[in-house]
Amino acid sequence: GKTIQVIPHITDEIKRNVKLLGNKYKFDFVITEIGGTVGDIESLPYLESIRQLKWELGKDALCVHLTYVPYLAAAGELKTKPTQHSVKELQSAGIQPDVLVLRTEHELSTTLRKKVALFCNVDENAVVQSIDAPTIYEVPILMQSQGLDVTILKKMGLPVGDTPGLGPWRAFLERRHKAEETAPLHIALVGKYDLQDAYKSIREALSQAGTYNDRKVSVDFVNSEKLTDENVAEALKGMAGVLIGPGFGERGVAGKFVAIKYARTHDIPTFGICLGMQCIAIEFARNVLGYADANSREMDEKTPHNVIDIMEEQKSITNMGGTMRLGAYECVLQKGSKAYEAYGTEHIQERHRHRYEFNNSFKDAYEAAGMKCVGINPESDLVEICLLYTSPSPRDYAAS
């Protein structure tokens, strides 16, 4: 019966979520990132929650503040005022950062570090440089070279011990550097979202896959909204593979169909994720099975050939918030399939975020035409992975 207030109700819930992992599992550290900019109104409840947590946990909590040190090319000088101002704002919220990590394009001098330490009220060895790196994978090595790990351990009163060699990580970086020297393998990422962070995990996954196969991978974005029968050949020219990206809604889907058809008829390996897999299934139904009006219920509720349909348990849901099929679900792979070869095991788990699934009513027709359903959820019998066999090796690889 109480009135919900930002303090204490919202802040208490934020604190509960921050402490959740630490209370539930045996972790040495739990890292929580508060994004945004200090001073923004949206971040105020989170900053207050952090202030309270710091007070409650004492030395068991440590605040690391990331700031940007701009470089004025005209003056040839790094400016620390933005960092000083940011820390002042943080202090006004009741938080004294323990460590400052300064993003910079140029090396920070000892004099500049002392200046920042003095005016931001932190130890000099707690001012850590984070210089621009070629890839994000270089950052842990750079942070270790700056002594960030030792600084954190000392400030939390924990034994320092021997410095880890990070052998596997360094080996990965060395392999990555060698892979970057090879001729690039071009992969077309077909999607509709202009903000490339929407596909960040896909880009990184392809990049890592390239490293482990000793080959540089160049991911070339292709805007599906601008893709037509007239320009698709030029857009996909020289591509070693095509990835049809995930998404929601009908916008940009027509262009995905164009890309899928071109890739299928020109023997270009194609991989569809989520909506991308559904688009591959729809294009196959239209142009191979002969269902010209095949579609997803998401795009056309009245289509008689709803090869992609809303999940049965989703049909009665009216509140769309947080009710999708979310998180990791089990998938059993068909032995001998390309998917089984890729994973090296029969039982896998992959994350999901959708309401629509392959309609099993059409399963026999697909398999008779060469598209095999090789990954099935054992509980719901939902199709998770399809493979199109049209040549000695499977070509279209569509994963839900």
Please describe what each predicted stretch is:
Residues 1, 320-324, 346-349:
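Conserved N-terminal/central alpha/beta ligand/cofactor-binding core
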Residues 1-215, 225-241, 248-249, 256, ...:
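Flexible phosphate-sensing "switch/lid" loops adjacent to ATP/NTP-binding sites
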Residues 128, 218-222, 374:
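General small-molecule cofactor/ligand-binding pocket signal
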Residues 235-330, 336-338, 400:
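Cysteine-nucleophile active-site neighborhood
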Residues 335-388:
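Catalytic beta-strand/loop cores that center a nucleophilic Ser/Cys/Thr
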Residues 389-394:
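Conserved small/polar residues in nucleotide/adenosyl-binding loops
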